[in-house]
């Protein structure tokens, strides 16, 4: 052909999932094609101008630890950085950044265009080429056929997307973009379960029409945090403040008086919306006892006058949106630049996926992002990286890889989706992870970078930085273990000055650091224990590892017990009707979910410990009891 049409991996869609998938496959050396309906919207932040948050920031750090793009792009585009839960334990601390939309998109596009093995082509995809239950390519709107060994679908909200503003609606993938109708129809012909979900976005406000003098500013942290393990604060652009306002009784009255004009309450929208990011009309009705709700006014960029009012996502008519906005303090004369809206779209049941995000029914077809029922840039990007990695491995006839629940929030995310499925847009929280003390933001690289290197995702620069950090931490911990003081040491007085009670017996540096009144900075400021590490990441890691060592050891013991079940594999084609002793309900659920391991089966709602015992005995009798390495 006069144009390249043979690839290892094709990625369909250029949002947060698609861009990470494309970068991952290409980093592994696979010839990769990224098909997008518009090159100018690669990495577009379709909703809020922010990255990270509780649970979400953990995913971003994991993406970064595996060589991904999101954290690096955020460091180049972030205009305000904060550590959430900074006063709490390290397991729930999370980084969040406001991002300049234009700079973020530029950072993503620049990375894609400079990635070897990756070709970008602008054309909507209308069909998949499927032969003998295996995907072998894609067909674009103009009839171009591209063939590949694996295909990754990362189409966001575009599949048969329908936008709602009041009682009016029209087809669209998001505001200003067409939907993907033909591809939606094609996917519905495949043996995959499909349903509808809904999400929404608030109106955007002209900053020049806001009276900021009436509002409370919210500043970023000092010193300014960074997202990437390779990042530094010097990469950040100019920093900006957010501002806070509140809804009030007048706001709520406007909403209650116009519920008959809401497509949700009028029954026009059938898709279920996100529980943890509800529309303002939902909040007012669900929390009727609340007199006000906090609204964050977030700048969309350094060169933009648009403000994103985080907390008033709505699909009410435009005139009602104007009343809502102008009912709030500081916004009395505000002007809306873009109306808020809700969007309904197709998603496919993630229980039809393997933990690698490959379809159980169409070989070589991978799904990532909102098509799997998730919500959020971070959740999409994490899935994209995993799907791109596994598409690359599939194309090279290698076994797939997926992290366990005790290894990564990405493991929790994929296990929740592929085991339990979802009936509403799924978002990540730290509370979803049972081993969250092990899954901290600060140790994402220690958990995943070595694996990423083996998988071909981590380049030489990141590997050298990581190796140096590991060596620093190990040497510093050994140094502290080797320094001893006793009650009659020459410098004991400066140590006693920091302690609640004078030193009564000999102790080394690590034992002193375990005391609640001592932190690493204080300890290394003492003559006997200095100098401190200059790298703040390594210094933090030393303190956390020492102070939480007992808790971490106990959690590791719990994990090792659970791994026995996780590593006990179940045959993919097992018909559970054959297993005598299981109830009809358990048989139906196991046949429906098709779990890949005993551990996964045990997390399905309604699968009892007794059922697991019966299953284990049956597997042993049949000679099918196998454990993964």
Swiss-Prot record:
Signal peptide: none annotated. NAD(+) binds at residues 273-287. The keyword tRNA processing applies. FAD binds at residues 13-18, 125, 180, 370. Its cofactor is FAD. One of its GO terms (molecular function) is flavin adenine dinucleotide binding. It comes from the Bacteria. One of its GO terms (cellular component) is cytosol. PROSITE patterns: GIDA_1, GIDA_2. It is found in: Cytoplasm. Gene3D superfamilies: FAD/NAD(P)-binding domain, GidA associated domain, C-terminal subdomain, tRNA uridine 5-carboxymethylaminomethyl modification enzyme MnmG/GidA. InterPro entries: FAD/NAD-bd_sf, GIDA_C_N, MnmG, MnmG-rel, MnmG-rel_CS, MnmG_C, MnmG_C_subdom, MnmG_C_subdom_sf. Pfam families: GIDA (PF01134), GIDA_C_1st (PF21680), SAM_GIDA_C (PF13932). Keywords: Cytoplasm, FAD, Flavoprotein, NAD, tRNA processing. Its main location: cytoplasm. GO terms for biological process: tRNA methylation; tRNA wobble uridine modification. Homodimer. Heterotetramer of two MnmE and two MnmG subunits. NAD-binding protein involved in the addition of a carboxymethylaminomethyl (cmnm) group at the wobble position (U34) of certain tRNAs, forming tRNA-cmnm(5)s(2)U34. Belongs to the MnmG family. This is tRNA uridine 5-carboxymethylaminomethyl modification enzyme MnmG. It comes from Yersinia pestis.
